[in-house]
From Swiss-Prot:
Name of the protein in question: RNA/RNP complex-1-interacting phosphatase
UniProt xrefs under InterPro entries: Dual-sp_phosphatase_cat-dom, mRNA_Capping_Enz/RNA_Phosphat, Prot-tyrosine_phosphatase-like, Tyr_Pase_AS, Tyr_Pase_dom, TYR_PHOSPHATASE_DUAL_dom
Binding site for substrate: 151-156
Region Disordered, residue ranges: 1-28, 200-258
Similarity annotation: Belongs to the protein-tyrosine phosphatase family. Non-receptor class dual specificity subfamily.
GO cellular component, one term: nuclear speck
Polar residues bias spans: 247-258
Keyword RNA-binding listed: yes
Domain Tyrosine-protein phosphatase positions: 59-206
Subcellular location: Nucleus; Nucleus speckle
Location of the active site: 150 (phosphocysteine intermediate), 156 (proton donor/acceptor)
Annotated PANTHER family: MRNA-CAPPING ENZYME, RNA_RNP COMPLEX-1-INTERACTING PHOSPHATASE
Organism this protein belongs to: Rattus norvegicus (Rat)
């Protein structure tokens, strides 16, 4: 029996006056979902873009018009950035938010069931890296993006993107976290995720170290100083309703047991006071400058639209056991 699927969570005796939490309905808006920007910006030097989970039409009755964020809205917002989405990696631990059929057929979709609050296990990390590497290998002659989301597009999403940049691209942990925070418009909140990333050792034999040499192209975004406040949220991992591990082949769920190819965006004016500012001023030539990381409050609120391509993405690796059905 697989503990992942059949484990049960017991509240035990409750000696407080609090009523037990109500079971969430299928059409309930995810908790705190409204607090986050729908879509971030492309992370310079990478193919990554992060966003919160889009919600299908049945949720719209409980949202104001300006709060709605559907798969179609996602497509439009990424097009507004003059970008093209090639792959969605869905990290939510449910199937209720939207259907794969709602996505354009030109976009690939991969679901990696990832439990919230706790640091993703090695199987989940391996699947994420493998999916990214395979996509990059198959799309090395174009500039399509990899969109990653969990519920809020922040903690699980930020952890796995940063983990890839650290382990595969050789970026320093603090640099990866800082880059993600700036481009997402929010900071990774969970302290256990941050601490786990900061313990990672940078591989010294990378051909292109993203945070030290030519792995990432220099940009106003990377040289701009930014003030980041990573406030802990529930420092330790919460007890999961489901425990144990799931084998790699069971983690990935796709339509018809294959990766369906499907295609997709962001309004930069939605950055608000209190969020991490978007990339720095456009129109300046930083080609001769070496980027660095430092801390300063009140970073620039300007945006830019330049694309950044990392040379390291021309050297993908992928295990022979992986299958990608077209």
């Amino acid at each position: 029996m697989n503990q992942w699927h059949y484990g049960r969570y017991s509240r035990g005796r409750d000696f407080t006056a609090r009523a037990p939490p109500k079971k969430k309905g299928k059409n309930q808006i995810p908790e705190r979902w409204k607090d986050y920007l729908p879509v971030g910006q492309r992370m310079p030097g990478t193919r990554f873009i992060a966003f919160k989970v889009p919600l299908q039409k049945k949720f719209e009755a409980k949202l104001m018009p300006e709060e709605c964020f559907s798969p179609l809205d996602l497509f439009n917002k990424i097009q507004e950035q003059n970008e093209e989405l090639g792959l969605i990696i869905d990290l939510t631990y449910t199937q209720r938010y939207y259907k794969v059929e709602d996505l354009p057929k030109t976009i690939s979709y991969i679901k990696i069931l990832t439990v919230g609050h706790q640091v993703p296990d090695s199987g989940t990390i391996f699947q994420f890296k493998s999916a990214v590497k395979e996509f990059l290998k198959r799309n090395k002659n174009n500039d399509k993006l990899i969109g990653v989301h969990c519920t809020h597009g922040l903690n699980r999403t930020g952890y796995l993107i940063c983990r890839y940049l650290i382990d595969v691209e050789g970026m320093r942990p603090d640099d990866a976290i800082e880059l993600f925070n700036r481009c997402r418009g929010h900071c990774i909140e969970r302290q256990n995720y941050i601490e786990n990333l900061q313990k990672r050792r940078v591989r010294k034999n990378q051909n292109a170290s993203a945070s030290r040499s030519g792995g990432l192209e220099d940009s106003a975004h990377l040289t701009e100083q930014v003030h980041t406040t990573n406030k802990p949220v529930n420092k330790g991992p919460k007890k999961s309703r489901r425990g144990g591990h799931l084998e790699s082949s069971q983690h990935v769920q796709t339509q018809s047991s294959a990766y369906s190819f499907r295609k997709w965006s962001q309004n930069q004016s939605v950055y608000q006071r209190g969020f991490v500012p978007p990339p720095g001023p456009a129109g300046e030539d930083y080609s001769q400058r070496r980027f660095f990381w430092s801390m300063r409050p009140n970073g620039s609120q300007a945006t830019h639209h330049k694309k950044w391509i990392a040379a390291s993405y021309q050297r993908p690796f992928y295990p022979a056991s992986w299958e990608w059905n077209v």
